[in-house]
A protein has these predicted regions:
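Low-complexity, acidic/polar, glycine-enriched regions of mature
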Residues: 17-173
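Sec-dependent N-terminal signal peptides
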Residues: 3-16
Length: 173
């Protein structure tokens, strides 16, 4: 009987999953955008999220407030909040329960919700898993017009219709 309980405990433990919260002090999401006349970038260092982990990431959910992106130019940021209708659509969210890992490379097949629209995307990244933390980095691109965003213009020329997104997200064990 004692063996049965020990085996049952080991069996249950081997299938346990751990929920890890994001360390938002050490996590960022960056974007860069371009116009014919100039390029700019912004950073959000107030990111929320969680992963389900059992020797690899099986699920991930990340959220960031639109208002927390900072390009270093308050006028541009203010105009961005208007264009992105931040009062109506305050958050950007990503969720995946379908990931593929090969070595330290990871592919998340998931959904991004931006400007009230949800789209399926593939996000490529790397995972650095050590004793105290899991660090996930990567890049992807989104096309604002696919999210019903009217592109802002300067001197009658619209900005380019893509945003490069990069992320460096840390989860403490």
């Amino acid at each position: 009987m004692k063996r049965y309980f020990i085996l049952l405990f080991i069996f249950n433990f081997s299938f346990s999953q751990t929920t890890l919260m994001i360390n938002n002090e050490n996590s960022t999401i960056n974007y860069d955008a371009k116009h014919v006349l100039h390029a700019w970038e912004g950073i959000n260092d107030n990111v929320s999220g969680v992963i389900i982990y059992d020797n690899e990431i099986s699920k991930i959910a990340i959220a960031a407030k639109v208002v927390d992106f900072d390009s270093g130019n308050s006028g541009r940021d203010s105009h961005s909040l208007e264009v992105l209708e931040a009062l109506k659509f305050p958050n950007i969210k990503f969720y995946s329960d379908d990931s593929e890992t090969e070595g330290n490379a990871i592919t998340f097949n998931g959904d991004i919700e931006f400007h009230g629209q949800k789209k399926s995307i593939k996000v490529l990244g790397t995972v650095d898993d050590n004793e105290n933390l899991i660090n996930v980095t990567g890049k992807f691109q989104i096309i604002p017009s696919e999210f019903s965003i009217k592109l802002p213009s300067f001197m009658l020329i619209e900005m380019e219709d893509y945003l490069n997104i990069s992320f460096d997200i840390q989860f403490d064990k």
